[in-house]
Amino acid sequence: MGMSAFEVLGPIMVGPSSSHTAGALRIARVARLLAPRPLARVDFTLFNSFSRTHRGHGTDKALVAGILGLDTDDERVRDSFALAEEAGLVFSIVEGGDDASLHPNTVRISMHPAEGRPVEVEGESLGGGRIRISSIDGVGVNIKGELPTVFVAHRDKPGVLASLTGALGARGLNIATMRTFRAERGGAAYTVFEADEQIPDDLIDEVRGIAHVTFASAVNVAGASQQEAGDVTLSFSSGARLAELCDERGCSIGSLMRASEAERCGDETLADARMDRVLALMHEEVCETLSFPRPSLGGFLNGQAATVARSAALLAHPLMGGTLTSAVAYAMAVLERSASMGVIVAAPTAGSAGVVPGAVLACGEAIDADSTALSRALWNAAAIGALISENASVSGAEGGCQAEVGTAAAMAASALVELLGGSVAQCLDAASICIGNLLGLVCDPARGMVEYPCQNRNAIGVAAAFSSAQLALADITCPVPFDEAVDAMARVGKTLPESLRETAQGGLAVCPSVCEGCGGCV
């Protein structure tokens, strides 16, 4: 398994969408590394789902923020247009419409430096904040950032590649991959190097001095699934292998994922500190929103979470019970914060970010769990989310809402089982039951915004997680193993029509009552 826990419980970001906001920002932030600075003008052309829903998702603001170098958790993202004006950067947002040959979340970024020729970069947002750079100046590339990466623009001349590889080798860098792309013989070419070691800061200046090199840059792709070193022993790519490792070590899923992350980053203390930050922000995104609700960008959300919490005394006993009522209110609160462009933890996406914290925090309060137990439950959730991310999808544009809320609910169900002392097998059963119960759930954001029905579906995701966890803990086994359920999720996602995959062109998004207040299709 190549994913860090914090690629699943993350990014920490300004809402409302991990793919359309955080992912878009990251594409633009990488693109700016591939062109000389300063930039005088940038033109963004959006395709497919990006084109149709960019206003409601804050994609336009995120792209400009990325070009300015802001990070996903910078609250100035919402003010990026004004920041660009202050910086003297001219930009345009163009809706490119549909192109079946492109990924559902594609943007083409044309950058015009103050000096030098323009550079055009095409990128894709893969879900959960992960991205891929797919083309530079019309030449196909594949930059995901899985290893330390160097991008070099040069002329297609004899001896250039030898000089480049010699420069990297002289610094002790082992080249893992080297791919050269050219538009024509003797013309513009690009070489992308991936190395096993980190890129020294001064190496780029040296590379820029090589004959026929026109530009060079180290490329850091935030959110990339970093490939593991050879001494990482706790790697797993299936639920079956995860269960085997837990059995071999006599530990829970959460404990194994924590140990795997410690191996990955080489520092157990650092891994724990990062999870402490995630847990603290989850508390904050719930508590602050319940105490101080604020309206969402689209106006659908404004204090519904607090209303649910206040209704508990009257409604909890005959209906959901106290713990589930709290969990639903907490989940709804996270969506309200995200929809007002507040800072949240995508878990695994922004559109489904309420399910895991809602379930884990509410259940933790009910049993008086300490922070160690809560963190272990989150480690567990991260393991389940990583497996689904790698073997199916967490992108609504690829797999519908089953990929987002369905994944989050499966993560939460497994986490609840571990929090309540269940076995590894029961955790995987709970996740499998949950996937089955939400299979085929469509993504149909009204007016292209991550508000309605997204908030309500987070509430339903919490309820699905609670019921699935209780079934598993009662030893109700699932006839379909976890890995097969994930495979089914992937297959179903591919069969969903495009209108039901985050395009706002089907389902509830096209109901007359929703469309009346839109003022124009997004």
Language-model features: where?
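Active-site cofactor/substrate anionic-group-binding motifs, chiefly glycine-
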Residues: T307-P348
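Conserved phosphate/anionic-ligand binding catalytic regions in large, soluble enzymes, centered on
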Residues: G10-V30, M341-A359, A403-A408
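C-terminal regulatory domains involved in ligand/effector binding and gene-expression control
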Residues: L126, A222-S225, A229-A313, G519
